[in-house]
Amino acid sequence: MSSLLSNIASGLEAPIGREFFDLVKAIGESKSKQEEDRIITEEIMYLKKILPSNGHSAKKLKELVVRSLYVEMLGQDGSFAYMRIVELCASNNIAYKKAGYLAASLTLHPGHEFRLMLVNRIQQDMKSTNMIESTTALSGVCRLVTEDMVPAVIGDVIKLLNHDMDPVRKKAVSALHRLYQLDKDSVADHYDKIRRVICDKDPAVMGAALGLILDLAKDDVSLWKDLVPSLVSILKQIIEHRLSKDFDYHRIPAPWLQMNLLRLLAVLGRGDQTCSEDMYEVLAEVMKRADTGINVGYAIVYEAVNTVTCIYPNT
């Protein structure tokens, strides 16, 4: 088996280097805990010696960072590599930059000082004209920003809600949701922009906004009740197969969008007869069309029934 893996590794331009492959192989083949500890200790000593050296290529630096992550996965301290992780986030190569952001999110605890060092990098990457850099930075917002960093990044996140590219707008909505979870007052001045996202031309962007609005409505439902007619209209369009078939699952149109809409309607219609009356017809149609005998259909029916039990009764 090991020879087969060696042949595969040597025959491919794998994303991992030979040294890392040999490390994983050696640990996997170790006969005792003592032997495993010896291998890990030797690896740590090697990394501590080579990481401070200058002149590493981005590719080599990424591999060394990955090896330090592997050391941490095995229960050892890999903090000696954290500064190099921050450097990797500044790489001009998108793949290495993404690796740096991911490594930082996995290793730097919320109170770590190196997170503050990444704020400026995140801001610069969000302003990039490269879509992938922007989405990578927005992922960094979701994973690395803490409550005290929110004011520094929220302005750039809000601007990206109007980006030309759909994936960037979707990521921006997700990042804004995370900022709201960290600081509920941070989005208070941007409700109008959040409302406009519901009407985004890309259903995936609109779907990302539903989770944010659901949390906002749970905190103050009165601010969002006026969205009920729009949400009902969107739900009706979905069940009538007006969305692209790309959103279908087992011939059920956009089932996860349907379920998120139903959860939101349940919150907005609770104890409100006027709002609830706007929902009765579409809820009945949702249950009728979803009852197809497959699991995802049952999930939609369940959410619809739950919504019915939450809103004002139809008397």
Language model features: what each stretch is:
Residues S2-A14, R18-A81, V86-C89, N93-T315:
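Extended alpha-solenoid helical-repeat scaffolds
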